[in-house]
């Protein structure tokens, strides 16, 4: 016992050396956010204190062999190397977060060694600040360690040291890993305050000791196939298209990293996709569209198959992928020629294996490019080269009808491509076009390579469509463009922004363009396309399906009739959307137009969403174990014709919705120093509405509230409406701001209807 207490006292005597090293690293990290230091300092210190208290026993165990050594040189060598490694890990995790804009958790469990090497190569840019800081920090730590080890009469008495260690063991189980904090609309700052080593350790421990979910609930009464249900997807697209004698060609373009915060109308950071914006004005454009995955691993299964995730993503099951139906396999079986093109390796995320399982006729990755073509970076070929490669192939492979999938890669770290310097110069030109104030441009300068890659990909798309219009069959083609996820390297306001991507459906067959504010997800694309082709062209679809989606919602106003999971990384399944609420890492948020979220205390909705999410996780885990998704009989031959009487868009009970009160046709106008808003409020219910107050809220580009104004309390009869004018005096500097028109409760001010949000205006 005496030997143990001696080593324990020695540990606490030397511990200030490690704490000092960690503190210096934290100060270096916070120093790169000097303008926000006041908001960051206290939460960061609390998180670091939590990390120290909770993980103290683990540090002690790692140090114990060295602490027990009698030879001073050997003891110092063991402790010095061990603690240097801890500091190096913390520094590397900080550097990763600075480069990737995201925290590193248990992600690496979801990738092969070959994929990890490719990921690391993509993040090869050296963070010289952190590299230099780590060298200095380790030197300081070793210097203090040597001095502390010389102390012959340590200040720690054995009972105090034992008590401190015992309390830290208890703290590990009782205290939270990180402080819960309101990010104030700046998720990018919130993750700065997180202790990176504690987050990494917690995520990996949680992954390794995760409990098996509860018993799954069957969807059809067949416990072996709980995802199977009757195919009831309605044809929401059909009324919007002119039909032709032959089925249309389909081209799906998956743009790496394309997010709504920098693309499309009202983009929070300004739109850097002028061509896509122009195309959106000629298309069906979903403003509140969701990618169910936060990384590329899930986009092909989600978009092309409306498939569940399994443990690490559906395609990660490789040759053990359960038998399943998809857009590709169903169309392939009915005469479509199917093709897939990407500029990167087909091995990454098992993309090639997934497309092979669909029976895809042509699968082309980086290995299929002409060797004379210049590679963009470690990931593969730049988007212009990818589109040229596909166009050249298509010119020699005419087919009617065709399904073509093109997946880009340029908008991915390290964001390098031919002609990069020219596009960096164009970033400044774009800032001028967007009227971004001079004092707001630091962010854009710091991330010029990212914004340059966005402009480059937008130009590559412009080039592709200019050439595609010359191709045979263009007039009978439907083009679908979306992002695989929102790139994380640019600052995000909140967790949902990672999943917020545009959906553009463009076609010469389209009767007229529309902007759609209702929510849908990539899970809804395949069911909708198959319902459209079945209803309009007589193609057959399976009578039973395993789709997670129920079809694209065409409602012009904001609403969500869907419920679905979100998986940010291969090992992170913590988010779920049901109606107008999002359950994220155990916390509930309400979702508003523009995909803005606010914390919600709706306990009934929280209970329902938690139950739905738990049920999904249970059957998702069962899928991973059994490798069974649908019976063979469902896949043998598509047989279901379209019957509109059996179709419905909403198939799940929602945790919460915003009822029957709606705001529409809101318009903003600034006259002198006054903001004037006109809007229509309507009751779409079969009964009279409760009392409500029209509420106007003005925010800046970061979502910070700047003021509000109220109208008169009102009630509406069934199916009645009223025009409302709201006004507010403005005491704001010149710039771009946003107005939200909300159906609010007379007493609490909380939303009780479908508002209209994020309406831009210029002061």
Enumerate the language-model features and the residues they cover.
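Short, surface-exposed loop/turn segments at beta-strand-coil junctions that are enriched for proline
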Residues: 729-733
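Soluble catalytic regions of membrane-associated enzymes that act on cell-envelope
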Residues: 192-541, 549, 556-559
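Phosphate/adenylate-binding glycine loop and adjacent helical scaffold
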Residues: 541-659
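Short beta-strand elements
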Residues: 750-763
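Aromatic sugar-binding surface patches on proteins
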Residues: 718-726
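Solvent-exposed serine/threonine-rich low-complexity stretches and specific carbohydrate-binding patches
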Residues: 706-717, 757-758
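Transmembrane and membrane-interface helices of multi-pass
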Residues: 2-204
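A short beta-turn/strand-edge loop motif at beta-sheet boundaries
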Residues: 684-691
